[in-house]
Amino acid sequence: MRLTNLTWPKAQEYFEKNDMVLISIGSIECHGRHMPLGTDTLIPDHLLEKIEKKSDVLIAPTIPYGSCQCLAPYPGTIDINGEVLYQFCRQIFLSLYRHGARKFVFLNGHGGNIKMIERLGMEFEDKGCLVAMLNWWLMAWDMNPAWKGGHGGGEETAAILGIDPSLVDKSEIGGELKFKHLSDNLKTTGFRSVEFKGVNVDIIRNTPHVTDSGWIGPDHPSTATEEWGKEMLETTANYIVDFMEEFKKVKLS
């Protein structure tokens, strides 16, 4: 059930009987040379399509933008300042709260949004609400450790292949991941992580200073298959439907 498709009397009718709303958020950012900029939004959107067929929970419009400062130099990336994003989402929550929403299920497609969602969760708990943050890619890891992946790696590439194979430019996947190290003894191991004497520390850099392509992770994009993506997306959507049914039962004080 989509909020955008309801008349206001129908919305009123929903909130008289229900207090849960499902919202998704993503980002528009680089995911390597082979992946669409909208990866983090396309995946939650696709999950919503599956969920809508199996659940009667009200679905609010997707928020397509996110906070992605470290990836901002890549052409096409749209970075929303963390405070601006928080205030924008807060206004959405306040409007829904006014109408009767008390349980918010935030389906998240982008790691850079996590701090903002946590902040909303703390604020709205003080108002008698609960905010569930569902980071789909982390949930998928728990469902099947073989699906574990990084940014623009096999996991996300498989998901996009499962949605629309034409969106993945396989000719741009390339060879092994090449990090840009700070020195012979300061070896880059991730977005921020640098290994020194067997210990990882964080050194904050823009992603083009870490790797050229923009994908990072232990799972090479070439390992992705359409079948993997379809199974992972179906399993994740089914889990979310089951979770929301259980979440409905929670009594708020």
Task: Kindly label every feature range from the protein language model.
Residues 1-83, 87-103, 111-253:
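Extended, histidine- and acidic-residue-enriched regions that form the cofactor-binding/catalytic faces
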